[in-house]
Amino acid sequence: NTTGKPEYELNLEISRRLYQELQTRGYEVVMTREDNETAISNKERAELAVREKADIFLRIHANSSENPDIQGAMTMVPSEENPYVGELSAESSRLGQCIIDSYCETTGMLNKGVQYYDDMTGINWSQIPVTIIEMGFMSNAEDDTNMADLEYQSLMVQGIADGIDDYFGNVRE
């Protein structure tokens, strides 16, 4: 990546800001980690979401590629054929679509859409609608520079929060 910011730092920065934004909008939010020292497995994260009676499970990530020209954002969800959580595919897809469309519309990030993955433990342990947002490619100079910029991060957070509003049918002011 060009900015030198590690993915785990970016993910936590955005997650913290999103936490504040969603609380401001009236959502109850549970974070699976609030620092970079917390070690928590994907299974434990999914179990926490169930224990807290969460309605959705959103995982915040940034992408990387061997090819520095690849850029854009996407969401990842289970397919209907997923042997573990196929029954979550339709609602997870709707969640992923709401979030990625709003995120890309707000940030101007290239929209790579909803992608189906059945080999991600971050998805396969879930018991509620789940999506992973890959916010951009840290291996792409433009995406990485944008994602490290505080003003751009505000757009990222707004886009994700607006997508969650869209999913729940909440009208924005």
Which stretches of residues belong to each language-model region?
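Active-site-proximal helix/loop segments of hydrolytic enzymes
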Residues: 5-173
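Short, surface-exposed beta-strand segments enriched in small/polar/acidic residues
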Residues: 1-2
